[in-house]
Amino acid sequence: RYNKIAVKSDFIAVFSDFSGGRFKLKKLSRYIKILALALSAVLTLCACSGDGASSGESSSAPDYSLDTSAKVGYVYNEEISRDNMTYMFEKSRKDIETALGLETCYVDGVAVSQFENAVKALKNEGCSIIVSASHVFANSALSYAKKDKDIYILSYGGTASLTNLTTFRPKLYQPAFVCGTVAAWNSASHKIGIVADDLMYCSNGVINAFILGIQQIYKERETDVEIIYAETKAQTETAVNTLEGKGCDVIFSYQSDDYCMYYCDSIGMRSIGFTNDMAYSAPKYGLVGYYLNWATFITDTVRTCINDNFMAEVYVGGFSEAFVKLTPYSAACKKETLTIADTLYDYVKKGKAKIFEGEIRDKDGLARVGAGATLDDMQVLAMDYLVYGVTYIDNIIDPVPNPTTSDLIVKKEYVS
């Protein structure tokens, strides 16, 4: 019979090893496994439980600005919806109106080829500050900012800045890494599926971080990772059904909407995905969601524009800046999940755990990151390979010969 006090002392001893500073992930993996085994024993024999709290921290609202004459326009690649990534930007649009008292508007469904015309449409409506709300616009935003110095542009996903252009990028690989641990701990079949859009921001980096997170619990080939690239709802359903048929019992989604989670929930499949509202996206079988929390950053940057103290930068934010967050872990998770995942979250947030620390091999076994080396954000963004552990890959995305374009109508309404 286990002794609660003795086990608790073991936990303290385990974690005290890390108090001296940074450690290697291989060492972390070993301790997470020790923690997992101990937790399992304690929870089974002593009926302990977690509290289900969220890992994220909240940001305070900015003060009102005196100058309310400026107008802010958003350019969206997709049509705005509660179900896709635009919803995370819409929160920032509301915050700008509430915190700064400014008027905002947007153009949605904009193709890359329409970016300049979309900006001009917003400019004609009086907008002097533009939020380029998709990474696919990064090059277009840079080009436009070079020739129009009368406006400020905040560009998502860009890698360069100008006197009137600031860019911001999220470390989405950080929550993906923790999510990998959640998936591994909640998988009984040791087969985990990924449904992703390969045109998403930092697609390989996010997927690789998720796989490396799995490997914090299981060794490289102790769990099969099977990937299907899909974009539309029909393709997503096909992908999920295929992965379920191959024995996967947890699905990780990296797409611009939450439909994969919704569909997984409808068939009783556990899922993890890009959402800030698990109760909306996957109320029954969703494990955890990850999302972008950039409203405060965007609002503060807009304030610098209207107060004439704009400072161009290339901003990269992660857990420590509360720029990316995790939702609370759901009741569908095993009870041990909270402690295991939050332990890893805390180390990543504090910079003690380096996600992409070598040696890292690609799916074919070729060393891509040498022992002791660590990739920086730009190197993660440039990853053109998948890490070792992937056992199946398929791409069912069909090219769209005549993609729809925007009518470039400037709108103000919010989605409910």
Model-derived features with residue positions:
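Intrinsically disordered, low-complexity segments enriched in serine/proline and basic residues
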Residues: 4-13, 17-18
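Residue-identity detector for glycine
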Residues: 20-21, 56
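Bacterial N-terminal signal peptides that target proteins for export
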Residues: 24-35
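Hydrophobic helical h-region of N-terminal Sec-dependent signal peptides
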Residues: 37-41
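C-terminal motif of bacterial Sec signal peptides marking the signal peptidase cleavage site
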Residues: 45-47
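Bacterial signal peptide processing site
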Residues: 49-51
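A residue-level marker of the well-folded mature domains of exported/periplasmic proteins
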Residues: 56-416
